[in-house]
């Protein structure tokens, strides 16, 4: 298990990105959080198997919704954190 901090920019606020990311994370059995940042980015903290996290990032970049346009997605490994589930932070 590992935990990654994922920063996503583009047209990702006000278009259902957090909801879509949460749904995808739950389908992939990832745990963590997703929240909007003041600078227009979305921050995701996700814990799971390495291959599953890679799949999650690939699917975030392509195909969540026609209204979502991911311009950049960066990942950084951070100390492993256990979450009970995956949720949106408001």
Swiss-Prot record:
This is Acylphosphatase. Belongs to the acylphosphatase family. The keyword Nucleotidyltransferase does not apply. InterPro entries: Acylphosphatase (IPR020456), Acylphosphatase-like_dom (IPR001792), Acylphosphatase-like_dom_sf (IPR036046), Acylphosphatase_CS (IPR017968). Residues 3-90 form the Acylphosphatase-like domain. Its EC number is 3.6.1.7. Keywords: Hydrolase. It catalyses: an acyl phosphate + H2O = a carboxylate + phosphate + H(+). The active site is at 18, 36. The keyword Hydrolase applies. One of its GO terms (molecular function) is acylphosphatase activity. It holds the Pfam family Acylphosphatase.
